[in-house]
Swiss-Prot record:
It comes from the Bacteria. Belongs to the aldolase class II family. Signal peptide: none annotated. This is Putative aldolase class 2 protein PA3430. Binds 1 zinc ion per subunit. GO terms for molecular function: actin filament binding; metal ion binding. SUPFAM superfamilies: AraD/HMP-PK domain-like (SSF53639). The keyword Electron transport does not apply. It comes from Pseudomonas aeruginosa (strain ATCC 15692 / DSM 22644 / CIP 104116 / JCM 14847 / LMG 12228 / 1C / PRS 101 / PAO1). GO terms for cellular component: cytoskeleton. InterPro entries: Aldolase-II_Adducin_sf, Aldolase_II/adducin_N, Aldolase_II/adducin_N_sf. Keywords: Metal-binding, Zinc.
Length: 259
């Protein structure tokens, strides 16, 4: 087995400044997912487009999320071919899912997929995510579902995933997990934080056995424009506000992602 320290140390010298910054932010995102307890050993994946190209970065299959660094991320082209030397391969199911999104969603920089207990629990419910919390209000304005087809190794599934995702930023994969995609790594992380919290609240509320209060439909409909502003950095809000604070927390608890 290849040790983490055997990864090439000169990656920064081989890539553009823009790609290196994307690598740093994506490595931070992996470690933040681990810090929040959303990781699933070496499984699941987060990807980010290499600026100005159709290539994307994804995790080396075999590293835990809390270990990932800017240099260890694997760069692949649209066909999944590695573009730089790495002792690691990528998760083939990860390629299927992430390439499907990046192929058609040119507004998306980052795709984040998780297998959390609360996320899977909600994904198993026929009614899906319910309008129970303020967090669910944010999600329901841009939510789609993609039915489970088994482990995502069949590339023919890509077209169906693309059709189901459409223009949404949130995707629930029944019997499987959660996915968010956004115009920046920061926004995509914030979206997953919101979706994950909405699922946690739903599972906890249901466990109490009491009759639940649903957010009225007119509030859901009227909140769409406001939600778009809060969730996206291009409006001056969204992830760009929270990201520096998240990095400060990460620097205190698990630094090293910039290597």
């Amino acid at each position: 087995m290849t040790a983490v320290h055997s990864l090439p140390a000169d990656v920064q010298a081989q890539v553009s400044a823009a790609e290196w910054q994307t690598r740093v932010d994506l490595a931070a995102c992996y470690r933040l997912v681990a810090l929040h307890g959303w990781d699933d050993l070496i499984f699941t994946h987060i990807s980010a487009k290499v600026p100005g190209t159709e290539d994307f970065l994804i995790n080396p299959f075999g590293l835990m999320f809390h270990e990932i660094t800017a240099s260890s991320l694997v760069k692949v082209d649209a066909s999944g071919k590695k573009l730089m030397d790495s002792p690691y391969e990528i998760n083939p199911a990860g390629y299927t899912i992430h390439s499907a999104v990046h192929e058609v969603r040119h507004d998306v920089e980052c795709v984040l997929h998780t297998h959390t207990a609360a996320g899977i629990a909600v994904s198993c419910q026929k009614q899906g995510l319910l309008p129970l919390s303020q967090q669910s209000l944010f999600v329901l304005s841009s939510l789609s579902y993609h039915a489970y087809e088994g482990v995502a190794l069949n590339h023919e599934e890509k077209a169906r995933l693309q059709a189901d995702l459409g223009a949404s930023n949130f995707l629930i994969l029944p019997n499987h997990g959660l996915l968010t995609c956004g115009g920046s790594i920061a926004d995509t992380f914030l979206m997953m934080f919101t979706l994950q919290r909405a699922c946690e609240v739903q599972v906890m509320a249901q466990s109490g056995g009491a009759e639940l209060i649903h957010i009225p439909g007119q509030i859901l409909a009227g909140a769409r424009d406001m939600i778009a502003g809060v969730m996206r950095s291009k409006t001056g809000m969204g992830g760009q506000l929270a990201w520096p604070a998240l990095l400060r927390k990460l620097d205190q608890q698990n630094p090293g992602y910039r290597q």
